[in-house]
Design a protein with these regions (language model features):
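A short acidic, helix-capping loop that chelates divalent metal ions and anchors anionic groups
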Residues: 47-52, 118, 139-146, 208-212
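Short, conserved loop/turn and helix-capping segments at secondary-structure boundaries
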Residues: 56-59, 149, 215-218, 222
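Auxiliary Fe-S-binding modules of radical SAM enzymes
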Residues: 1-27, 190, 194, 201-207, ...
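Conserved N-terminal glycine/acidic-rich loop preference
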Residues: 5-24, 40-41, 75-79, 123, ...
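Canonical Radical SAM [4Fe-4S] cluster-binding loop centered on the CxxxCxxC motif
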Residues: 19-60, 73
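Conserved G/P- and acidic residue-centered "switch" motifs that form tight phosphate/ATP-binding loops
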Residues: 84
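Generic beta-structure capping elements
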Residues: 32, 44-45, 134-138, 202-204
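Radical SAM/AdoMet-radical enzyme domain recognition
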Residues: 59, 63-79, 87-195, 200
Length: 247
């Protein structure tokens, strides 16, 4: 890794802060734009042109970037995302490099878990602390409708592999789509609780892959409450720090 940049003439700012004084201590790094799924709310079914391998950040560049963040900018947590980060064969090397930093940050991964069953142990040994798995349905037909790929069995195998490797806690990120999987939410929560997984319903982002995003069709927090209230007793919890939507 190269030397740190000269900050002599820069303001003495020990942390990343916005104009409201809120400090950013989390760093999200997309390791690739490629994904082996084609979720309807994220990518078009075909026609995607992805970056070439030599256009992606190298292991050394990623570790150097994180080192600058933790040593100069107050970064405490690093999350690797994509695309699908597991499609990088050097992911273990990336995580090991970051975990070996003198000021080691918390290291997490957002993944669809395809192939994780074969790598979970190595990733944990490299220094991975925890994972978030993107999973919108445990019903094969619904999963394939949303992802355009018949790969639910591989996602579930990946989750089982992560559990066996001790990557706790495992959080499941679910995007609810009206008329497609929203009615499955109570059963999905049951499935997660049976496996000691933490379910998080996340807001659909307006990536507009198929030019169908409309605010009026979004599932709200109130909608989620109404779906779960008949089966569960719900109680408010403390707000996460500064919202922390990506934790």
């Amino acid at each position: 890794a190269g030397a740190l940049p000269d900050t002599t003439d820069r303001p003495d700012t020990p942390a990343l802060a916005d104009r409201f004084g809120r400090e950013a201590t989390d760093l999200r790094l997309s390791l690739t734009d490629f994904c082996n799924l084609r979720c309807t709310y994220c990518m078009p079914e075909s026609g995607m042109v992805f970056l070439k391998k030599d256009q992606l950040l190298s292991v050394e560049e990623i570790v150097r970037l994180v080192r600058i963040g933790v040593e100069r900018l107050g970064i405490q947590q690093v999350r690797f995302t994509g695309g699908e980060p597991l499609t990088r064969p050097d992911l273990e090397e990336i995580i090991s490099g970051v975990a070996s930093l003198e000021r080691r940050p918390d290291i997490s991964l957002t993944t669809n878990a395809i192939g994780l069953d074969h790598r979970a142990e190595r990733l944990r040994e490299a220094g991975l602390d925890r994972i978030n798995v993107s999973l919108d349905s445990v019903v094969s037909e619904t999963f394939e409708r949303l992802t355009r790929r018949p790969l639910l069995h591989r996602v579930l195998a990946g989750i089982d592999g992560a559990r066996a490797a001790g990557l706790d806690p495992i959080k499941v990120n679910a995007v609810l789509m009206p008329g497609i999987n929203d009615h499955e939410l109570p059963d999905l929560l049951d499935w997660c609780l049976e496996r000691d997984l933490q379910l998080r319903v996340i807001e659909q982002m307006p990536l507009d892959a198929d030019h169908r995003w409309e605010r009026s069709t979004m599932i709200t927090a109130g909608d989620v409450h109404e779906m779960l209230a008949p089966r569960y007793a719900l109680a408010p919890v403390a707000e996460p720090r500064d919202g922390a939507p990506a934790e």
